[in-house]
Amino acid sequence: MNTNSFYSQKFAVVPMLVFCLTLSIGFAQHPESARGDKSQTFVLADSREVKIATPDNKLLQRELAQVKEKMSKNTPADSQRISYWDAGAPAYRWNQIAYQLTGAQFEVNNGLTFFKSPMTWMNMAIYDATVAAMDIKQQTSRKRPFEIDKSIKTVVAAPATYSYPCEHAVTAGAAATVLAYFFPEIADSLLTLGKGAAESRVAAGVQFPSDVAEGWKLGEQVAAKVIEKSKNHLTVMPWNGKQPSDAKHWRGPYPVGAVATMFKPLVMKSGDQFRPAAPPDFTKEMEQMNNFKQNFYTASQAYYWAAHSGLDIWTDLASSKMFEYHMDRNTLECARIYALMNIGLYEAVIAIMDAKYAYFGIRPDQLNLDHKPLIGYTPPFPGYPSGHAMASSVVATILSRIFPQDEAMFKQLAKECADSRFYAGIHFPTDNNVGLDAGEKLGNYVFATLNKQM
């Protein structure tokens, strides 16, 4: 599989925010499921815990006039914005935005925001808010504007759900609020972006203004609950561990990522639940690396995976499967998939760093001081097990349970990711193999546990 050509277009963080306001992309429309009342949630004891106003039918004619007026003023830029946010499920664009923001944080403040996994908390908020929204849709049974006034011609095909509240506004309120918390330096831009996403649905003729206003409030309320939950899980204290001083273990000026060993898991019983056995002596594997001959393929794989956090590759792949299997208009199911994946990744961060700082597995360039990694650097934390290998294996395993017909492809991609770290000269084979194995166990555990609830 040529993953390099499959995932070619990437965007810088700041341009991405501008891009979100202007790009126009369209996809085929498909009906979506509307029922959320049987789905358990992460932060809501009950989906009815979050309250929004009941639609006021006395204002119906006024709101219809507002929809028509809004549509009459659409500019080409408005049309592009409508098409952009209409692509896929409401969570689709927000996951694209979130992985760009999160991936850029790896080298900022010792990766603290990156390790906190903002995408996990965002997708939990989106999922819970969507469950609540689908319940309220069933309770209110509000028709969409064009169903009441046949003179309204929508710009896009409307979702096959009731109108109130707007699922895009619910998602935008949840996503933008959570991301604004994790990225305070661009909070205003994110909230403005979210408001634009929500309001695009009125301009498209598929929602009433109150659908959007109350939908945003719903998402915002759920986001606040998720943020409070994150504060209880993302404990940040100075790391008090001691580094081994002998030449057989990793050593570094600062233990990057060690803070994640103090995070509270969402699914695992403890951070060491999937800790692998201690690593072997790497002397023989160092000889294997010294004798390894690069070729075009191995070098390209090394650079490809080194250039990405993995969040982008796996998120894009999951999204493409949702489109491929015509799930992209099932708002709740797509929210569920994104949540499953990203909770798996959050658990992986904790498990990976637990093992790394339990064993201080040495890196090749520390075992052999003459060794030069192909990609020009070595990550600033212990090597065993490989984080890329384990995290990719977790996601590959979860996606294999959701899309079993594609299991071979997911597993092959995870192996390519793992192998690339050896090609890059920064991981021994055991780092990668153990990472793949531990990731599969963790992925199966996360899916089996959460699938009973969601």
Regions found by a protein language model. Name each.
Residues 2-15:
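Bacterial N-terminal signal peptides that target proteins for export
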Residues 8-10, 20, 255:
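Compositionally biased, intrinsically disordered low-complexity regions enriched in proline and serine
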Residues 14-24:
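Bacterial N-terminal signal peptides
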Residues 27-454:
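Acidic/polar surface patches and capping/hinge elements
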